[in-house]
Design a protein with these regions (language model features):
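Active-site-adjacent pocket scaffolds in enzyme catalytic domains
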Residues: 1-58
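C-terminal domain-boundary segment and adjacent tail
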Residues: 35-134
Length: 134
């Protein structure tokens, strides 16, 4: 994690997978769907074991819906990026949930989030902390 002194926000980074001199995202999303399951598993294990910290993972809801509408006329690259392996995402996610222990970010990273100045105080009921125009 990296605290952002000026803003008070806390950045919790996603795991990456080093490949051919590049850091590829390995914390979920399209890369979880497009890359082999072993790539995500390896990246998460590395974060847990080598870096000694909990990994963060996310999935887009649409990536769990193989029956989503298909749009005609999309370029091949877009079709691959959006539709490839849609039917595999839910089974992979179930496997990932079995293979590792998971919890909410607020529970796993409570110390970092609670650090003085880590996050600005906010309340939907407090006009002083409400965003302008809301």
């Amino acid at each position: 994690f990296r605290p952002r002194e000026a803003s008070g926000l806390v950045e919790l980074t996603l795991p990456t997978l080093g490949f051919a001199g590049h850091d590829l995202p390995a914390g979920g999303g399209g890369f979880f769907r497009l890359l082999p399951y072993a790539a995500s598993r390896w990246a998460i294990e590395r974060v847990n074991r080598v870096e000694g910290r909990a990994s963060i993972f996310y999935v887009h809801p649409w990536e769990l819906d193989p029956g989503q509408p298909r749009f005609a006329g999309l370029p091949a690259r877009s079709r691959l990026r959006h539709y490839l392996n849609l039917g595999r995402t839910a089974p992979r996610l179930r496997r990932l949930l079995r293979d590792f222990r998971w919890d909410r970010i607020a529970a796993v990273h409570a110390a970092e989030i609670a650090a003085p100045g880590a996050l600005p105080a906010w309340s939907p009921a407090d006009p002083a902390t409400r965003r302008p125009g809301r």
